[in-house]
């Protein structure tokens, strides 16, 4: 065996032992993400409307019943099994195993708390700036 071929073959085998498990365990690139929405009114509308047809909305949360009701009616047309919550902490408790990511569209001073909770659960977070209300939260 030529040394160059040995090194090349060894590199391919070694690389595949690390690379293949990540491919097999990952989601299909064509599969939809399971999204949770935190804050569905006001600016939140502009954050969830673009993805309503491309991703699975599995949970939504808003403290304002008017916004939640309007959003729920629209989201349920495409995602009839979406769950509605008033408190994002309850949503995380009940839905954490069903979520891949959350979109946080709450007032600025509440971004940090919802985002850090989601990240601690291993969820991906989509959030607008500012992420934190003050420097001590960063």
Language-model-detected regions and their locations in the chain:
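N-terminal Rossmann-like dinucleotide-binding module
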Residues: 13-78
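Beta-loop-alpha module in the N-terminal Rossmann-like domain of NAD(P)-dependent dehydrogenases
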Residues: 67, 82-138
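N-terminal secretory signal peptides and thylakoid transit peptides that target proteins
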Residues: 1-14
């Amino acid at each position: 065996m030529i040394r160059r071929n040995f090194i090349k073959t060894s590199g391919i085998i070694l690389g595949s032992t690390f690379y293949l498990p990540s491919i097999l365990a990952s989601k299909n690139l064509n599969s939809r993400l399971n999204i949770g929405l935190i804050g569905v009114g006001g600016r939140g509308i502009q954050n969830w409307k673009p993805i309503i047809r491309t991703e699975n909305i599995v949970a939504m949360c808003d403290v304002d019943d008017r916004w939640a009701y309007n959003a729920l009616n629209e989201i349920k047309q495409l995602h009839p099994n979406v769950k509605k919550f008033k408190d994002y902490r309850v949503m995380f408790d009940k839905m954490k195993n069903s979520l891949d990511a959350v979109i946080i569209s709450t007032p600025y001073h509440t971004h940090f708390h919802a985002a850090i909770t989601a990240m601690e659960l291993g969820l991906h977070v989509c959030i607008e700036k500012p992420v934190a209300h003050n420097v001590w939260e960063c």
